[in-house]
Regions:
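N-terminal carbohydrate-binding accessory modules
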Residues: 1-41
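Short, charge-rich amphipathic segments
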Residues: 2-9, 72-82, 188-190
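Extracellular structured ligand-interaction cores
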Residues: 7, 45, 81, 90-92, ...
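Generic hydrophobic, helix-prone segments enriched in Leu/Val/Ile
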Residues: 11, 36, 40, 52, ...
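Short, solvent-exposed loop/turn segments at secondary-structure junctions
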Residues: 17, 27, 54-55, 99-102, ...
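Hydrophobic faces of well-ordered beta-strands that scaffold small-molecule active sites
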Residues: 18-24, 48-50, 93-97, 157-161
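Aromatic-lined substrate-binding rim segments of carbohydrate-active enzymes
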Residues: 32-121, 127, 134-148
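Polysaccharide-binding and catalytic clefts of secreted carbohydrate-active enzymes
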Residues: 106-213
Length: 213
């Protein structure tokens, strides 16, 4: 970013760019992505935001590539990147990596799900889950390290860390009740209270309630 005529503008290699970005339809196949990227390239749009899903199979999206702890179907991810670059050799790709977990993880850690006030579980872990954060952070590190050492790195402009419902970090289940009342969320809230107030007395004074601890 640099100032240009009194406004912050995007430059790349010294050249002014609009920063306009396209995103293929979420359930598109590799061919569908190719066609969309090609058409936008013809209109002068080189930035491409593409979603890489560890969890949700939706149409022919690029998903189900997180196979086990530390194991990934990198050829599936690379095939999607390859189609983008074939459609536009000048593509500047924003890799949107979803911080979701696959079914094998959900089966292994059912206690990490969010829970509504009515007792309904979310379909993905609570954002307060330390187990989710540690495992997804490792996945993100593994994927970015692999891509940065691949031949696709020169076309990757950046990474978008997407989480929660629809990538905007809404809590899972937010539209279906009051979340999050899971034990992991309760534990996280208690830890936050301890850090913020340090003693019961300070908490009681701040909340104007002599009964809270």
């Amino acid at each position: 970013l640099a100032d240009f005529e009194g406004m912050p503008r995007l430059f790349r290699d010294g050249n002014l760019e609009s920063g306009m970005c396209m995103m293929p339809e979420c359930a598109a196949s590799n061919l569908g992505v190719f066609n969309s990227v090609r058409d936008f390239a013809a209109a002068g749009v080189d930035y491409v935001s593409e979603i890489f899903w560890p969890w949700l199979s939706w149409g022919e999206n690029c998903s189900q590539w997180w196979l086990a702890p530390g194991k990934y179907d990198f050829p599936k991810i690379e095939a999607r990147l390859q189609k983008i670059i074939e459609a536009n050799p000048n593509a500047k790709i924003l890799v949107r990596c979803k911080m979701n977990v696959p079914q094998w993880w959900l089966k292994q850690y059912p206690g990490e799900l969010g829970t509504s006030a009515e007792g309904k579980n979310s379909v993905q872990p609570s954002l307060a889950s330390d187990r989710w954060l540690v495992d997804c952070s490792q996945m993100l590190y593994d994927v970015t390290r692999h891509l940065e050492n691949s031949r696709y790195a020169r076309n990757i402009a950046g990474y978008v860390i997407a989480g929660g419902e629809t990538s905007e970090w809404f809590w899972w289940g937010w539209s279906e009740g009051k979340f999050d009342y899971s034990q992991v969320a309760v534990n996280a809230f208690r830890q936050w209270l301890s850090r913020k107030y340090s003693t019961d007395k300070k908490l009681q004074e701040a909340w104007n309630d002599p009964k809270v601890t």
